[in-house]
Regions:
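Periplasmic-binding protein-like
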Residues: 48-54, 127-136, 218-258, 269-289
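Bilobed "Venus flytrap"/periplasmic-binding protein-like clamshell domains
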Residues: 44-72, 84, 107, 131-197, ...
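N-terminal hydrophobic or amphipathic helices and topogenic motifs
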Residues: 1-89, 264-289
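A ligand-binding cleft/hinge motif common to bilobed small-molecule-binding domains
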Residues: 103-116, 175, 197-226
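Short helices/loops that flank or line small-molecule/ion binding pockets
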Residues: 88-102, 115-116, 149-152, 191-204
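Glycine/small-residue-rich loop that forms an oxyanion/phosphate-binding "nest" at active or ligand-binding sites
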Residues: 111-129, 133-139
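Sec-exported extracytoplasmic/periplasmic mature domains
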Residues: 72-76, 95-99, 114, 174-178, ...
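Generic structural signal for residues in well-ordered beta-strands
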Residues: 79-81, 186, 224
Length: 289
């Protein structure tokens, strides 16, 4: 299916499992979350939708609140966005029944699926209609770094310790012969956009971010040094406590979105890039790395 190479991703995941035993991460920064105000309406039944802290709280609210409004208008439920301070908090919210649906990352989804029975119901598509996703190692456009090997002795910024891109970055460096010990320093930052901002400011020589983030910072002076193999897009998931009727209704609304976009009925300008083109049905098999 598509060009997602499981033969490439299998050794990546095996590498990540082994590395997670010994790799010491810097904890995510606890960031105050903005208050999200629900729009009043006739629907009394609240459904909570979580998003892992891949971006700053302000960016998540800006990009995902339109999706909440779409779901509220196209289902019998009133959707409310619920943020978290780190990736695992969203998983905990799903497991404890505090949220019903969520956008997870690939790495957190594998953990949540195996531990709590959380299932993928939809996968975002890109502008070409594909579920392929990528992570990019970035540098400043003014940087003299031209290859991954040039990162020896340089500083490097990763996103959250629980982000798939963080692990992918470590693997890509290792494949190029660059160990973490070869870097002058490295750090896990809270958000992908913060990684790009710090590389842009010169606080780090390079960093690893989602490709959509790298693209959004290109005009500001970011250059892609290397791109990861294709990986599945981030899964939209349902908690195990959600009944089959609610699951089906929400899944149908998500899968119908791309038709409404194509028909000009729904305008997704200003939505988060990863959900602005609609969805395909979720396939758990793609995450069986």
């Amino acid at each position: 299916m598509n060009n997602i190479n499981l033969k490439v991703l299998l050794p990546v995941l095996l590498f990540l499992v082994c590395l997670s035993i010994s790799y010491v991460f810097i904890m995510d920064v606890e960031t105050p979350l903005p208050e999200i105000v629900s729009q009043p309406g006739e629907k009394d039944e609240l459904v909570y939708f979580g998003v892992i802290s891949r971006y700053s709280p302000r960016s998540i609210v800006s990009g995902y609140q339109p999706l909440m409004e779409y779901l509220s208008e196209n289902t019998p439920y009133n959707f409310k966005l619920k943020l978290s301070r780190n990736y695992l908090e969203t998983v905990d919210q799903l497991a404890m029944g505090r949220i019903d649906f969520a956008s997870l990352g690939n790495y957190t989804y594998i953990q949540a699926h195996n531990k709590y029975g959380i299932r993928c119901i939809a996968m975002p598509i890109n502008a070409e209609g594909s579920i392929e996703n990528y992570d990019d190692i970035i540098v400043s456009t003014h940087s003299e770094i031209q290859s991954l090997k040039d990162l020896n002795g340089k500083s490097f910024a990763f996103a959250s310790k629980q982000s798939f891109s963080s692990w992918m970055g470590i693997w890509m460096l290792k494949e190029a012969g660059v160990e973490l010990s070869d870097l002058s320093r490295y750090e896990n930052l809270s958000y992908h956009d913060l990684v790009a901002e710090k590389v842009l400011r010169g606080d780090f020589d390079a960093g690893m971010v989602k490709a959509v983030v790298a693209e959004s910072f290109k005009a500001s002076g970011i250059r892609v040094l290397a791109r990861s193999p294709a990986i599945p897009s981030v899964p939209l998931v349902v908690a195990s406590h959600v009944d089959s009727t609610r699951k089906r209704v929400v899944q149908n609304a998500l899968l119908r979105l791309n038709e409404l976009i194509a028909a000009g009925i729904v305008d997704t300008e200003g939505w988060d890039t990863e959900v602005a083109n609609g969805f395909r049905p979720g396939h758990d098999s793609l995450y069986n790395f």
